[in-house]
């Protein structure tokens, strides 16, 4: 181990997330590169460090710092370096030298105790003197907090958030209730707060720990799509989370509920939790989710105004539309169009080939014939693009329709709840009719934001396939609306002749019904290649991608999509992307590349955004480079191509499917992943010329019927199953669907009954 004392001459690099810093320490007439987690320090500060001497191939001798201490500046040289480092706004080297030359080693005492005396220096007013004093005190307080929090394993970025929100109160919060950090701030989850609490000496069965654990258990359940949990499941999840099973489990297998019930009752009285009876069981909601679903129910029922039209007039209008469009609607399609005229809310659901698009076009024509304005929307950019191509009308993502204007608040960082929309109750959408496609993908918070921007009297049409996978976010919106039986629902069931000749459509309906599919390659758009193990399936997938399918479906390899149920393993997303990249976009001296979080990204790579980012700025450009639109927000599932990588500025540019260009910095780029292969969940709302699905084996909870159905229906011209027939058949037979505990259906029925 080596010890050194010196000034921070310069900071070369700092990772704001984890505090890893590369700096140059000046001691005597020498300098030394130092690396380590330094937290909040500035150039010019005096450090005592201890660490291990290492030798870097490029940068030479360094010290890998294991511990350090900030020593307050006392001698004139260190005072000049600290005050003149630029860390204090408005104070440069010249003024710093004047201050220290006048006050010498008494400078910091003067700044802290008699700041008005700084005005004795030429160039410093009383106001500026007080500002310098405040900054020095603020930096001292902040540094003390950073060092204090670092002792609890908290990163500099989170420490900065904590200090910004609480200031000097943070000391009391850590000592009395560190779980408040998890309640108030994103990025400090329950597990982080629990570790802080452990270090602070909080007992494992303390009521503050149990209460926070219950809230976290419900929040964590929302990541699996739940908006509530039955009380017994919440108790079990909380006890397992807190590691209290042995302490609370009785001999008969029940739990000792005394302390748990006390904590639960307190949370209900504090209105953090809401307790209701659903399906004759105690259902527990986080208050946010309960009131969000309650408001959704209220708004839907208020919008559902019945305005019956004359049947004869409606029939004449439909006949005219059929003549003008040259399309004959079947009885269910006609009914769907009529229902949208008669009701404020209409739901149209159906599988592939049942004429949903034809029906949407007829609905648009009917309303426009009456001089009404129709707006089209979908949850993803790809789905909106498909809607636009199918109707010839502009379709926007729901986020863009609502004019997303930024995301999470800086204090909390909670994206979905704090997302800011330009369209809302005060500034509603100016339209007569709204048609939303791919409604099965829309989660609780997004439909809540949409409904808030719709005025009573506007017609709303929800279109979707109820058998697709549920939304990634919490809730079961489309299914709950349908099953509430409070609205007009039209189920399109007829598969039209042209669609019926498609192997994709025919087999998708068979899969949905649980009927086995003959993998005999008798239909040219539904192919099967038998491979017994993962490596063989991988090789076949690469061969299909590079040589067979592009010519067969007249598409580039880049446009063909590999879909898989899983992320891990040879046939998981991570491995598939690594292998496919080598063939589709191989290393080239003319292509710049960059490693981010262990993944190589290269110019020309196909990538996907994997989380909503409401702050990312984008611009749309014409072929000549003229910017014709701009905005903020790139969303989970958006796909694009890396156009340029700039290793000087550590940025890369991605152009997304709808011609939005985005520049990512290093941190933002961690929200991207290669997208030659994606999970079936991520493919929702998209359509590809061809889909390859490698299916050799997998855990039963992933290998389900509706997952297979969703994957198959993503293909437009051809789907190719690669793997084992037994696995394919088992997926069809596995109708186990992950049960989502959502309260919207109950809210709709309950609210309706109360209003009657």
Located regions from the model:
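Conserved helicase motor core of P-loop NTPases
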Residues: 466-632, 751
